[in-house]
């Protein structure tokens, strides 16, 4: 959507992680990191952000995929740390990062386009105690939930043109019932 960016890799090392993030904060208004934000032995992003003085706005959202997402600020800079699993990271990018990017360059329609569509035949959605973003395909005015919803499976996104949002603890949703659909950017 017309924004430039730089990709940089960092090893599982706290000092190197901190230096890379510090440099990114000097050069950019919005910094997006992927991986290293959970609670594993080699997840140093949260520690580095804390040491750099990034103020946490939120961390860990009750959703699937993408629970270990972080958003914070440092002065006038915005920092996102997205999960390391590819599909979880992409889902969070669509739902959280894109609105901030769009807002930063003055767009009024910052969120993904939202529709209410019936669930396709043969589909039903089970409730979870946390919100869900399900990769989906809109076909003939209905939305079909795709197989392969694992947060590590990026290939399903290649087939999807939407995400279905399901609130935490929602009732069972059966075929034909209306669901909230977020159109993915094309």
Model-inferred region functions:
Residues 7-10, 35, 82-83, 166:
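Active-site-adjacent beta-strand anchor residues
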Residues 1-33:
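Phosphate-binding glycine-rich loops and their immediate beta-loop-alpha structural context
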Residues 12-13, 37-40, 88-89, 171:
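Glycine-/small-residue-rich active-site loops that bind phosphorylated ligands and cofactors
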Residues 48-186:
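Flexible glycine/proline-rich
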Residues 31-45, 83:
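Glycine-rich beta-strand-to-loop/alpha-helix junction loops that act as flexible
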Residues 11-21, 39-60:
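Short catalytic-site patches enriched in acidic/histidine residues
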């Amino acid at each position: 959507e017309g924004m430039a960016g730089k990709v940089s890799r960092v090893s599982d090392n706290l000092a190197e992680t901190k230096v890379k993030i510090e440099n990114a904060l000097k050069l950019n208004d919005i910094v997006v990191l992927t991986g290293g934000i959970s609670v594993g032995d080699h997840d140093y992003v949260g520690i580095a952000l804390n040491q750099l003085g990034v103020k946490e706005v939120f961390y860990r959202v009750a959703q699937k995929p993408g629970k270990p997402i972080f958003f914070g600020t440092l002065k006038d800079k915005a920092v996102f740390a997205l999960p390391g699993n590819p599909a979880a990271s992409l889902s969070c990018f669509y739902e959280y990062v894109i609105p901030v990017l769009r807002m930063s360059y003055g767009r009024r329609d910052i969120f993904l386009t939202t529709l209410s569509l019936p669930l396709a035949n043969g589909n039903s959605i089970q409730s979870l105690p946390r919100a869900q973003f399900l990769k989906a395909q809109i076909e003939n005015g209905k939305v079909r939930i795709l197989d392969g919803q694992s947060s590590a499976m990026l290939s399903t996104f290649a087939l999807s043109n939407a995400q279905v949002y399901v609130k935490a603890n929602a009732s069972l949703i059966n075929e034909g019932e209306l669901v909230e659909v977020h159109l993915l950017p094309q």
